[in-house]
Amino acid sequence: MKKLFISQPMRDKTNEQIKEEREKAVEIAKQQLGEEVEVIDSFFEDAPHDAKPLWFLAKSLELLSTADAAFFAKGWEGYRGCRIEHTAALEYGIPRLF
């Protein structure tokens, strides 16, 4: 079983939309990897009210460092945080799934 980090656009989406996209990402990742995955919880529903974007990115990169693979959801290219996560995965040899 591989540990899976999911990078996805979240701005202007409801919690329900985010969760639905994550479920789809998990199914695609399982097909691509050919095995079950343990999802790393990078959806910060209980983040501090005054948390800035850089706070979220720092937490995400910390979690990404523990991943066996990273899935990049549709539209990731248009979001700064997702692009930084992608660059980190690429530079540190974490397999990327799309």
Q: What are these model-predicted stretches?
A:
Residues 1-98:
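Conserved catalytic or regulatory cores that recognize and/or transform ribose-phosphate-containing ligands
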